[in-house]
Amino acid sequence: IMQAIGQDDGSTLGTNIPRLAINRSPEDDDGNQLPVGHFYTYDSSTGQNVYSKPVTLRPFISAMQYMHYDAVKSEYVNRSIIFKSWREEAIDILGGTKCGKIPFKERSSLTPEQLEEQRTIRCYKLVYGLLSFDKGVTAKGETTSVKNLPVLYRVTGTAFSPVTSALDLLNKRKKLMFNCTLSLNTKRQKKG
């Protein structure tokens, strides 16, 4: 959060804010069964990942960021600044904008290779907030709970719109997001 608000240039190594994500793996490296489709995050108080569904999130900051992932290198090779509005120019670390992402309606003249590269450039919705849940578990099946844990919930793809819509609804109701608590749940959807 300190980097996002300009208090830290990112040059010092420190503790990162844990990410809230959806678990898609049926087991961990130790063979423990994990709850697929549940939210998970790293809980530093227990030193392990914790899983739960549903969870609540009290959002404080909402922003977006373009990132370009290189599967061969297994790393992000470019990222834009964190921006809060589509009216802002998303300058990236390589000197371009939006990590080279081209609007869908302008892609008709691209080669198959260029189209494939476009699929590796994504816009992420970033929501910084406080995570809470009562009925969680660890990978070993121990029950746990989390209360007001600072997290980053980073979504893209099909999860981008529902998160954005929920925050837009708060804006339309003239409610400050940090005065609200969102209930997050997942639903399995099959492709095709």
Predicted regions and their residues:
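Extended serine/threonine-enriched, polar tracts that run as long, contiguous segments within proteins
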Residues: 123-192
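OB-fold ssDNA-binding interfaces and closely related basic DNA-contact patches used
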Residues: 1-144, 191
